[in-house]
Structure formats: C-alpha cells, structure tokens
Amino acid sequence: MDAQGLAALLQKRLREYLNEGADHLATGGAKDYPEYQRMVGRIDGIALAERELLDLVK
C-alpha cells in the first residue's frame, strides 16, 4: 500500500470514528455530563487528527 492509499484508509477510519461519536451524542447516548464531555473531547481530537492528515497529504 502506498502513502496515498494509507492516508485515504486512515481518513476513512477517522471519519467513521467521528461519525460514531457524533451519532452517539445525537441520540442521547451520554449517560451523564462527564461522559458527554469525554465524547466531545474525543470528537474534537479525531477532527484535529483528520485535519492534520489532510494538511499533510496536500
């Protein structure tokens, strides 16, 4: 697998994790505020990683 293929696979995986987290929150999946905060932080971190990956691929 070349670098472009690896980057595309990683971006797809990151996007899946981001969407799963957003769906979890959107459906009321957080049982309390600390879990909500943790999930928002996770989504923010995944979004940052995806942006960095896209910047590196340019």
Predicted features along the sequence, with ranges:
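Intrinsic-disorder/low-complexity detector
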Residues: M1-K58
